[in-house]
Amino acid sequence: MPTVEELYRNYGILADAKDDVGQHKSAYQVILDGVKGGPKEKRLAAQFIPKFFKHFPDLSDAALNAQLDLCEDEDVSIRRQAIKELSQFATGENLPRVADILTQLLQSDDSAEFNLVNNALLSIFKMDAKGTLGGLFSQILQGEDVVRERAIKFLATKMKTLPEDILTKEVDDYIFSESKKVLYDVTGEEFVLFMKILSALKNLQTVSGRQQLVDLVSEQAGLHQTLNPADPDSVDRLLQCMRQAVPLFSKNVHSTKFVTYFCEQVLPILSSLTSPAEGIDVQLEVLKLLAEMSSFCGDMDKLESNLNKLFDKLLEFMPLPPEEVENGDSAANEEPKLQFSYVECLLFSFHQLGRKLPDFLIAKVDAEKLKDFKIRLQYFARGLQVYIRQLRLTLQGKSGDALKTEENKIKVVALKITNNINVLIKDLFHNPPSYKSTVTLSWKPVQKTDSGQKRMSDETSSTSPPKKPVVGPKRDSRQIYNPPSGKYSGNVGAFSYEQRGGFQGGRGRGWGGRGNRSRGRIY
């Protein structure tokens, strides 16, 4: 094993040789042997090996393996030095291998070491983006679970920091094709991260690009399969996929396939869906997704059939008035609860699809059923007016900070919901029914005005929906408000389904059966 002095002497030979450095193979071999020495010798070897690496192609494998030995040394300072210099080996055919190695080194739990690996990956990204991606995707597809997880997060967080000239069309196409391979077997969290990666690609900002992403989500959601309502993973998968699809829809990228699936496969089994997590009102989440998607539904093959399914589900949530006994009192101990959040979603969806078949209630629904529907509408409208008056009374005179308390924020949302329902019911009371009004769903952001707080009224909620839905609010936005009187019940809330970060049990359940990877160095 060479000493420190011998390492310096052979370094001097190579440094002084200048253009003839390649003729001093024995001197470079001495430096390679430095990895077998003590801490001082190893630190010097970690610096000297990469410096002359390119001059000795015959020793390239030996040099790279020597550096890798140092990257795995027990001494953290030696590891850091070796990793810091590793990008110098990323030349020609070696680059994908170096990228693969650096990707494996992402599993380090030492923060300084981890940052060095990130920086090294970014530096070789700028040399050859496609080659670097080859190493990353190799580990994502075949590496250990911890390496896979960190490689995906690297792509999701670091890609956006790269200059535009690096992410060429060829690179974008490569990312898309490799991502599709990965998506055959992903967890929920991984799927969300890949949608983040793909949605940011320049090539996929066009209408055709967005359509490709929608098709990708459609495959992941399993729209060709029958939904098993008893399997929480299947329900979770559907909900997470839909949340990724919603921001992609527009007037040119339609949600028809998804809305059709919801009407045909999900609505009939809505009440039997198993919640994917405690505290999730899965029925409400499904109905909110359907409402958001319905705005972008194109021509539908089975429109009348699906409108019927939607209509029947709406009837389930709109109770008949209680029967009265001779003295005029209600025969029941309590009047039916009015589930405003559900009805807002169902009415909105029905209103959106009804525009495509405006004579549905007149020509496609029999007279008795239509009469029953109008009775339910009238009863709901009466309860609605009572609720709106109560809410306006409690909010009267409040502005600014007073409206920012949790209780008042919930009441404001409740007022949005009831105003929306009021507008939609008025449309359906027209003869013939009208589908002209537009409302902004209660959980969607409203446009700010220069004059400050908007006055809460039917008019304020009757605004055009945004062309592109936004990502749902975070977990803490769940809002439930019970009316003061206790007579009318409202499950009132903004979209509350949080991104759980994975399907139950992670990979190996729900979205595929990836087993644990082998441990140890696989360079």
UniProtKB/Swiss-Prot annotation:
Gene3D superfamilies recorded: Leucine-rich Repeat Variant (1.25.10.10)
- Entries under Pfam families matching the protein: API5
Q: Which family does it belong to?
A: Belongs to the API5 family.
Kindly list the GO molecular function terms attached to this UniProt entry: fibroblast growth factor binding; RNA binding
Q: What lineage does UniProt assign to this protein's organism?
A: Eukaryota, Metazoa, Chordata, Craniata, Vertebrata
Functional summary from the UniProt entry: May be an antiapoptotic factor.
Q: Spans of biased composition, class Gly residues? A: 502-515
List the GO cellular component terms.
Answer: nucleus
> What is the protein named?
Apoptosis inhibitor 5-B
Q: Which UniProt keywords apply?
A: Apoptosis, Nucleus, Repeat
Instruction: Tell me where in or outside the cell this protein is found.
Output: Nucleus
Q: Does the keyword Transferase apply?
A: no
Q: Per the record's keyword annotation, is Transmembrane included, yes or no?
A: no
Which residues lie within the region annotated ARM-like and Heat-like helical repeats? 1-360
Q: Which InterPro entries match?
A: API5, ARM-like, ARM-type_fold
BP terms from Gene Ontology? apoptotic process; negative regulation of apoptotic process
Annotated region (Disordered), positions in chain: 446-523
Q: Where is this motif: Nuclear localization signal?
A: 454-475
Main localization category: nucleus
User: Subunit info?
Assistant: Monomer.
Which ranges does the record mark as transmembrane?
none
